[in-house]
A protein has these predicted regions:
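Sec/Tat signal peptide C-region and signal peptidase I cleavage site
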Residues: 1-5
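Outer membrane beta-barrel
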Residues: 6-192, 264, 281-296, 302-325, ...
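Detector for outer-membrane/organellar transmembrane beta-barrel domains
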Residues: 12, 183-315, 323-325
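Extracytoplasmic loops and strand-loop junctions of Gram-negative outer membrane beta-barrel proteins
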Residues: 33-36, 125-130, 223-229, 271-274, ...
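A generic beta-sheet turn/junction motif
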Residues: 153, 251, 298, 333-335, ...
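Outer-membrane beta-barrel "beta-signal"
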Residues: 178-189, 362-376
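C-terminal structured "cap/appendage" subdomains that terminate the fold
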Residues: 322-336
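Predominantly the C-terminal beta-signal and adjacent terminal strand-loop region
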Residues: 336-370
Length: 376
């Protein structure tokens, strides 16, 4: 998701502009990840650095413009993350045009800043993260979304979109990427800008129980020449997922949160890795998280211990499967705007990585990480 916070400057009764910023930085120590191969790595990283700009030109016309760092030290490490013209009419139909989040699972629509844990998405990435140029970064693409609520009580929501998808490669016909998401709020309705989501409201959103279904499809999105120089037939990408979020405030003031997701990717007969640019995942993926926000403050914040498990079951063979156990604690100072996270991880996600499902190698390793997040 994207923030709509910071300083707001009112021009008149209908026109305004706001500016904000967000930073996420971390330290990680991973077993056997040092260049020597048998020592722990020790790495500081700037994971995200964003500038937010939002505004309204007319009561029905808004815009959103956000920048991001690509986590490098090059001179051109900032790029346009979002550039959206928003035409918002009523609860039923609203239209966003430009570079924006493609409809997908909750983890992707949360983005890093509105997830319940510091490392926000451990399951394989959808097709919208495989695009060309900067439009393929962080789940964005250039296109159009239509979103709204299908019921008067706003419990049933939807978003559907059409995007560039993968440009070039095997897609000689320049096919578009089609995406959609529908969700139902069984209890209180989640309140987020547009079709964005969050993975926790720290007890301030009421009693939450929401189930969402998302899907993406692009014809001839995969294929090309594999790593051995063999021409592979093109194949269609089909991905879909089901996610659940539950949250409630208990009698003692504590907040219990659970989140889960199932994801399925089909590469249309093209083997994972048999592509000139992609080593995409094909198979089933599962993840689940349970969090408990303790009542009362410790210093300036609250403690939130959690556990999480992720399993990515690659159908090409068990050697490309990977899983991870994670236990950690968040120190919540100001919700998603200021928090510190300490986590321990064990599995082969840190050694095999999250992108290559073709010929990745790695053992189960231990990892300790510390993350800092702040935004305004």
């Amino acid at each position: 998701g994207s923030a709509q916070a910071g300083a707001t400057f009112k021009i008149d009764d209908t026109k305004w502009i706001s500016i904000g910023a967000g930073i996420r930085s971390s330290f990680s120590a991973v077993e056997d990840k040092a260049p020597a191969g048998d020592d722990w790595s020790n790495d500081f990283a700037l994971d995200n650095a964003r500038i937010y700009l939002n505004g309204q030109l007319h009561e029905n016309i808004k815009f959103e413009f956000n920048t991001e760092s690509i986590m490098s030290n090059s001179a051109n490490d900032f790029f346009v993350l979002d550039a959206i013209a928003k035409f918002e009419f009523n609860d039923l139909v609203n239209i966003w045009v430009g570079r924006q989040l493609v409809p997908s699972d909750r983890a992707e629509l949360n983005g890093p800043y509105y997830h319940s844990t510091y490392e926000f998405n451990k399951t394989p990435f959808y097709m919208n993260d495989q695009g060309s140029y900067t439009a393929g970064k962080y789940g964005r693409d250039d296109g159009i979304n239509i979103w709204g609520a299908l019921t008067a009580d706003k419990k049933l929501t939807y978003v559907i979109g059409v995007f560039n998808g993968r440009v070039g490669g095997p897609d000689a016909d320049d096919n578009l990427l089609y995406a959609g998401r529908i969700s139902y709020n069984f209890l209180d309705v989640e309140k987020n800008p547009g079709y964005y989501t969050s993975s926790t409201y720290y007890g301030k959103g009421g009693d939450i129980l929401t189930v969402g279904f998302a899907a993406q499809w692009e014809e001839n999105a995969l294929g090309g020449i594999d790593s051995k120089g063999v021409v592979q037939p093109s194949g269609d990408f089909l991905g879909y997922s089901v996610d659940l979020l539950g949250e409630t405030t208990l009698g003692n003031g504590a907040v219990a949160t659970i989140e889960g997701e199932y994801k399925r990717f089909d590469l249309g007969g093209v083997a994972s890795g048999a592509d000139d640019k992609l080593g995409m995942f094909e198979g089933d993926a599962y993840t689940g998280t349970a969090l408990y926000l303790l009542p009362g403050k410790v210093g300036i914040g609250q403690l939130q211990p959690y556990v999480r498990y992720t399993y990515n079951d690659e159908q090409s063979g068990s050697s490309q499967d990977r899983d991870e156990y994670e236990a950690g604690i968040n120190y919540i100072i100001d919700g998603h705007n200021a928090r510190v996270s300490l986590m321990y991880q064990y599995g082969d996600l840190n050694s095999k990585g999250r992108l290559n499902y073709f010929n990745a190698t790695g053992d189960d390793v231990h990892a300790i990480k510390l993350g800092f997040q702040m935004q305004i």
